[in-house]
Amino acid sequence: MAFFLEALLGGLMAGMLYSLVALGFVLIYKASGVFNFAQGAMVLFAALAMARFSGWIPGWLGIEDKFLGNLIAFVMAGALMFVLAWLIERLVLRHLVNQEGVTLLMATLGITYFLDGLGQTIFGSDIYQIDVGMPKDPIFLFEGVFEGGVLVNLEDVYAACVAALLVMVLSLFFQKTSTGRALRAVADDHQAAQSIGIPLNRIWVIVWFVAGITALVAGIIWGSKLGVQFSLTTVALRALPVIILGGLTSVPGAIIGGLIIGVGEKLSEVYLGPYVGGGIEIWFAYVLALVFLLFRPQGLFGEKIIDRV
């Protein structure tokens, strides 16, 4: 039982991180109706900014306190993501209002390669470390209940708590604030939203900035675990099955989908891997996504598309 709980908790914590990356896709799609292929590049760019700023700031400002240095680096990286959001709206999205979805999709591909090159030009291409003080040592829980206890990585616990808190804040933002309702209106119909006075340009800046902050938090967590390197862009590929499973238009769907895939990967690898030679964790999510594409393409919580003729 203890072994099962270890795998279950590990899957839930990994699932929260998947959900965090998937939220960036959902936020952009809900506000602009475009699938943002640049989300992985945004995670990398934000992580690079955080890693380099946290290394440069002590020398620039003479700050010895590590927490204060990381806090200033986070604020600076967040400000950079806001500037990035403003530039994307000003230079790209503003000129593509009401264009076909494939046009917007190609625009996000261009943004992807631009961010990859810009990040390498500004911050370099080495592997960097992000140290925000999360403990690395594992701990044992429920030692009084199970013999030997349940082994849990404390860093994963902290990361999952941060991800869960951000997911909760974003869910409340979308459901309870006037800006969140305006974002949903823009997603439904750009022209109708503009006709009732919703400023489309400002809404797009807000949603790309929120997605940028989400990418920043995801980049910090993944960078702390794996190091900041250019392969970090592939973390977005791990989120693709999540949004297929949960639904591209659903914030709760991104959360539930991430948890299902995280738990499914861990349990299948632990209990089925020995019988098939291992490696299930690599392809499990994609096979599950393929099943949903065949039988429920809108996902668990996505909106079913009905064409009227």
Model-derived segments and their meaning:
Residues 14, 148-228, 251-257:
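Helix-loop-helix "hairpin" substructures at the membrane interface of multi-pass membrane proteins
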Residues 60-111, 118, 256-261, 265, ...:
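Alpha-helical transmembrane segments within multi-pass membrane transporters and channels
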